[in-house]
Amino acid sequence: MSRIARRFEALRAAGRKALIPYVTAGDPNPDNTVPLMHAMVAAGADIIELGVPFSDPMADGPVIQQACERALRHHVSLRQVIGMVKTFREQDAETPVVLMGYLNPVEIMGYEAFAIAAASAGVDGLLTVDLPPEESHDLVQVLRSHGVDPIFLLAPTSHEARIKRICDAASGFVYYVSLKGVTGAATLDVDAVAEKLAAIRAHTDLPLGVGFGIRDADSAARVSRVADAVVVGSALVNRIAEHEQDPEAGRRVVSELLAEMRKAMD
């Protein structure tokens, strides 16, 4: 059983939902990332999503675009991000880590080379936001052969045939994007989310995570009532940006928000 599957099974047994924070690796500097990962786990994170900085993050809003820019000022590469996970694993062998980013850096590294390096460092999953499921077969096969879960996004606009295709390709969990548009966008309609999750559950037994639009403890709690996991990104990255000159303070305010969310979800 994979680390992600084990984590969801333990949460289910405890009657709890997963809290999944997203941060961009290398933001505001490379030395901050591993301590931030540990701080988030201490604050109640169940799975960590680690963004791989990319020069053209078209699915992301300005908050995460700027996080990528801050990380790329330090020339943070995919190999370095994998190295950060390896360092994190020296002290934490249990918390699943999913890399989230764009296909180009993985293609440049090569699917096989990436999967081998990621698996040996302790990466549990990969979410490539710009890889359509129709074109994902080769990467999915390579990831699975090395025990890395391919994770996919579903959107409010996803039709039934696409939902089925994605659920067939995915493992670990399925990530439902609760809003149209880019990350960091506006309001959240939990009833509409619940309706869409019911349609997705007809095609998979995988846990369903919901992200986009989760900003505070209240929205995290409301989404946790209908989803298996709550993903929070821009709200955390905003706080990191506000404390760019004092990363330790940034880690503290990120931890405070996650602890509030965890308490509200439980």
Swiss-Prot record:
- EC number of the protein: 4.2.1.20
What does it catalyze? (1S,2R)-1-C-(indol-3-yl)glycerol 3-phosphate + L-serine = D-glyceraldehyde 3-phosphate + L-tryptophan + H2O
Name the enzyme group at the top EC level: lyase
Q: Keywords in alphabetical order, please.
A: Amino-acid biosynthesis, Aromatic amino acid biosynthesis, Lyase, Tryptophan biosynthesis
Q: Where is the active site?
A: 49 (proton acceptor), 60 (proton acceptor)
Gene3D superfamilies in the record: Aldolase class I
Q: In which pathway does it act?
A: Amino-acid biosynthesis; L-tryptophan biosynthesis; L-tryptophan from chorismate: step 5/5
Quaternary structure note: Tetramer of two alpha and two beta chains.
Q: What does this protein do?
A: The alpha subunit is responsible for the aldol cleavage of indoleglycerol phosphate to indole and glyceraldehyde 3-phosphate.
Q: Which family does it belong to?
A: Belongs to the TrpA family.
Q: What is this protein called?
A: Tryptophan synthase alpha chain
